Every structure is written in C-alpha cells, then in structure tokens.
C-alpha cells in the first residue's frame, strides 16, 4: 500500500549526519534525492523539521535560560533547517515551499492550512518551520498537529535507529525491536519515541506513526510504499 499524503518528521540530528553539530550537505543531498523519487510517484509530501542540530530548547532551559525564550530560539533553528532543506530539494528539481508558524515573510510563507494543502495538491513539497509557533511544544507534536490539519494518512518519523526498541539499542545489545505496537503501549510503557502529547494527538486522530532509519538510502521511498522497514505505531 502506497500512502498518498504523508507527513515526514525529520529530526535536526538527522541533518547533522556524523558532524558534531550543524548541517551536513551530503545528508541534505541524500534526503533530497530520496524525496524527489517519492514526489515522482505522485505522493503528496509535507515535512516538519526539528532544530536539535543547532539548538535544543530543553537543553537551553536546563542550562538556566528561560524555557519560553529557549524554545523560541529552537524555533528559529528549525527555520534555518527548513530553508536549507528547501535549497537541497530545489537543487534536485523538487518544487518546494517553506511555511513558518512565526511570520518571516522575506524568507518563507506564513503557515496557512489551505495554502499548504493547495501546494500539496499541485505536487509541491511543503516544509513546515518554526515549530507550532508556541513554546513548550516539541516539533514531534508539531508533526502530529500538522498531519491532522492537512489530513495526512501517516506520520513518518525519520531517525537514527531503524525502529522502536524496548530500550536504547546503542547501549543495550539485547534491546528488542517492535515491528508494531499500539499508541497505548507507547504511552503506558513510556517508550521514548515521541513525547506523549504527539502520541496522544495521533491516537485521537487515528494517524499511524512509522519510525524508520533515515540514513539508509531509499528508505523514505520504501516507507511511503508501505514496506515494513521500521516500526508501526497504530
């Protein structure tokens, strides 16, 4: 089963690749090439991008910064990532629009739901930056919110691991991977895949979540085609 309208959630760390921080142009190029193949198959794709490769609000808050201020700085970091991703996509011929939750009219459109959906219908990729425009909400929650707003069939969370595990597979060799699990299991077992607000929002709107490895070439296309390459939360 190929999904027709997809919300792809990219973490800031995914854009960092092997670098300690910032954006790895080779990773952006690889993601752009994968996305171009998806769009060629007439799949409507929207992207929410995080900012953890540049600044993380929770970390800033823990270091003594006011939490709301730290979150606003994090939102600006996501906009940097969004326009960098737009550049990469347009270099491989993918028509792309950036919409931000905080108005920055010189570099991006403001987020307007109907306009975003019109772009998707015309075959353009829409990259959402600036989080949801409010502090105290993660970009995972933004992904769930935007997916519900644009009537996406699935949220695809592209990460550094190939699915959801019962514990950190980088620390525990015996970690067990789930091929599928329920929203309730994620919430009750406090499995660290997305924050509880994002999971609850997807649960309430019956939007499945696919978690997969972004660094394996071609995985975005495989995930969109419905191949069982990661973990499905439903």
Curated annotation (Swiss-Prot):
GO biological process: 'de novo' CTP biosynthetic process; UDP biosynthetic process
Single GO MF descriptor: UMP kinase activity
Domain of life: Bacteria
Annotated binding of UMP, by residue: 51, 71, 132-139
Enzyme Commission designation: 2.7.4.22
Gene3D superfamilies for this protein: Acetylglutamate kinase-like
CDD domains: AAK_UMPK-PyrH-Ec (cd04254)
InterPro entries in UniProt: AceGlu_kinase-like_sf, Asp/Glu/Uridylate_kinase, Uridylate_kinase, Uridylate_kinase_bac
Record field: catalytic activity: UMP + ATP = UDP + ADP
Regulation: Inhibited by UTP.
Sorted UniProt keywords: ATP-binding, Cytoplasm, Kinase, Nucleotide-binding, Pyrimidine biosynthesis, Transferase
Keyword field contains Cytoplasm: yes
Subunit description: Homohexamer.
Name the record gives this protein: Uridylate kinase
């Amino acid at each position: 089963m190929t999904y027709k309208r997809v919300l792809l959630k990219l973490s800031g760390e995914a854009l960092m690749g092997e670098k300690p921080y910032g954006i790895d142009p080779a990773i952006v190029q690889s993601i752009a090439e994968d996305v171009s193949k998806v769009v060629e198959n007439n799949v409507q794709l929207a992207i929410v991008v995080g900012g953890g490769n540049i600044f993380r609000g929770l970390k800033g808050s823990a270091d003594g910064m006011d939490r709301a201020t730290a979150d606003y700085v994090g939102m600006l970091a996501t906009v940097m990532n969004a326009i960098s991703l737009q550049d990469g996509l347009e270099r491989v011929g993918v028509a792309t629009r950036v919409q931000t939750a905080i108005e920055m009219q010189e570099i991006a459109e403001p987020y307007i739901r109907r306009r975003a959906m019109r772009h998707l219908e015309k075959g353009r990729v829409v990259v959402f930056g600036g989080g949801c425009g409010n502090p105290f909400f993660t970009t995972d929650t933004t992904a769930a919110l935007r997916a519900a707003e644009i009537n996406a069939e699935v949220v695809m969370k592209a990460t550094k691991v190939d699915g959801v595990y019962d514990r950190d597979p980088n620390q525990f060799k015996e970690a067990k991977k789930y091929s599928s699990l329920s929203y309730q299991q994620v919430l009750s077992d406090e499995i660290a895949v997305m924050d509880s607000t994002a999971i609850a929002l997807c649960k309430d709107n019956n939007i499945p979540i696919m978690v997969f490895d972004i660094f394996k070439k071609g995985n975005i296309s495989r995930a969109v085609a419905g191949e069982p390459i990661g973990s499905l939360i439903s």
